[in-house]
């Protein structure tokens, strides 16, 4: 056969295999693949999410996915056309029909009819065959491949195969038969893979190799695995696959084999007594491991089968059948009558019609303040001595039917007619009794009897309107002997401190509060620390027995002298009252100024002045400013100056060099009112310089020599003794010759002076940052002529900061940047450290030539500098002869 013949044969084969290549494609017409669809379901109860089948809608190429709408809201059509159950459905008739709508690109509504048929063994487009057991079983056929570009009327959707759990058998039990259309052409062998087929435990699902019957070999448990996914395979006798693997989903349908279980055996809650109907108390919860999505086997319904006690009504509580919330059904909860209710709660599946279990709910009725406290008895009598506070008068008792030790039981007592707040009632937390006490002392002379009205309530307010219980308390005041009362309790009297002795200062008396008792009062002084006062015991007149002194710091504080006076009556027993007498002593200028200190040491050489403070115990204006003067010839050797403007201190210093030893200085001080006083200061002159640190008193060595000399020369001549004395006086006078303050001018020439010893200083903070006009980031460009320029990254320099405290960091960081600069030394180049403007031109090194002329070494100008530079001029000046 020639090449043209082979080409023609191949073309015919291609046309025979692919007819769409040999004719023009049909035009696209939007619409459903069929006018109606029929899907068969295995039973009347359809669980939620069950796949029923698939409808197809051709919207032509390029159009978006179609949106389907079912006129029966119990079913849902997904965008891929798969029809599922939206919520559990029960088919009352063997057949159910509804419409599914879709819209084309022109918004034209298109519809198709969907019919559901109830059949035990079905498939909507497969024939039925008898199973080996003689029952009619579903047959699944491998889907064939699609050919051409024409619109397909229907797509293959394999609905899940349902298998009830807990089946009794006999096993193996046939589920479905797998068929291949290639059985007419060749012998086909079938196999399955997937869960429990070829994975452990192997063999739960098997398939007959030649007939394609899919079987289950044992009962299934939905609570363990609810869905199995298997793949069926078809191969020819030579082992070649003739069909694509087909997915088979086996859904284990639930059986009501588990009863609900409560989360607790006993539920506990509380409710307030008097709660209104509808008040929620608690919620009980039960669970069921059966299928709660597709069946009612886990739909739990709650009930209350029993109540204990069944009073005052047999149904005091109700429970929501679906949620398990227990609430109050009727009024009548009373803690005092029935404090606790025990309920039997039942939970049953199938919405309360199936398997059931029970639990216990215990409801405690909480107390509310629905019972008012009552006095028992309602009349009380008590007595209390006068003037005593916090004294118990009587005990009040109440009864309360509410729960003890709760706010609804705890009593609160109130005295209704006690406007002056003279009484209080304290509640005992254990017995709830109230103790009536006096809040402050009562006065028998003012009132002998009180009639009180006491009301009682609770800490918690009443839940309902209740009458308030009251009691009547009669309180008798007992008269006692009261102490006399000084009027006023504290008396202040102002007298001068030079008040005469024996004169009456004041009269300080007390009154007798017991008006019904005619008693006599006597007075005496209880405390008089300075023994300055005396009192008339009958009249209470106080007079002086000694001179008063305001400056007595041991007894007088802030010019006030305090004395305590007591008054005693003749009652039985006697009572004593106390009064305080405050004597304010007016100042009198009876004290002269006194210097402090009065003893001091001076150095003989370069003595330091001493500060003398002036003290005056009197008060202004009897004090500063003071006047000071030296008396009795003290001004010859000493001077005084005022140290401050107020003239309250002096500066004492010697006029000349004094002899070693003790000196007496008479200092006269005068206050502002011309009160003067002369004080002698003891001054010792020490053998030291400047400030006295360790004063060594001079030993009279020379004077000591006179006595031994006189004793040694018993037979000497008086003239020889006088001569020796004259010689000693001459030697002493030479020793005390004053040295000049400054050495002669010639002696200072060879002294060495250190002028650079300035001691420690502080860091200079007074500088202007603006003077740093150019930082490293703005330094002038440096051109190098000795090295070839290279392309290198220029280091980044930190700009000059505005904060002066950052100058140190600024210098350190830029120094590090300069050290890492690759263009920096050791290369020879011009380095610019800081540009400060143009400067004066400096001479070059070549200009520093060695001079051979005498003019270059002219040092004659040194002669003008005086004698101290004469030697320097002689050394370097030279003459023409040199």
Curated annotation (Swiss-Prot):
Name the source organism: Bos taurus (Bovine)
Write down what this protein is called: Cadherin-1
Q: Output the Gene Ontology cellular-component terms.
A: adherens junction; apical junction complex; catenin complex; cell junction; cell-cell junction; cytoplasm; desmosome; endosome
Extracellular side: which ranges?
Answer: 155-709
Q: Which UniProt keywords apply?
A: Calcium, Cell adhesion, Cell junction, Cell membrane, Cleavage on pair of basic residues, Cytoplasm, Disulfide bond, Endosome, Glycoprotein, Golgi apparatus, Membrane, Metal-binding, Phosphoprotein, Repeat, Signal, Transmembrane, Transmembrane helix, Ubl conjugation
From which residue to which does the signal peptide run?
A: 1-23
Record's subunit section: Homodimer; disulfide-linked. Component of an E-cadherin/ catenin adhesion complex composed of at least E-cadherin/CDH1, beta-catenin/CTNNB1 or gamma-catenin/JUP, and potentially alpha-catenin/CTNNA1; the complex is located to adherens junctions. Found in a complex composed of CDH1, RAP1A and PKP3; PKP3 acts as a scaffold protein within the complex, the complex is required for CDH1 localization to mature desmosome cell junctions. Interacts with the TRPV4 and CTNNB1 complex. Interacts with CTNND1.
Q: What is known of its domains?
A: Three calcium ions are usually bound at the interface of each cadherin domain and strengthen the connections, imparting a strong curvature to the full-length ectodomain.
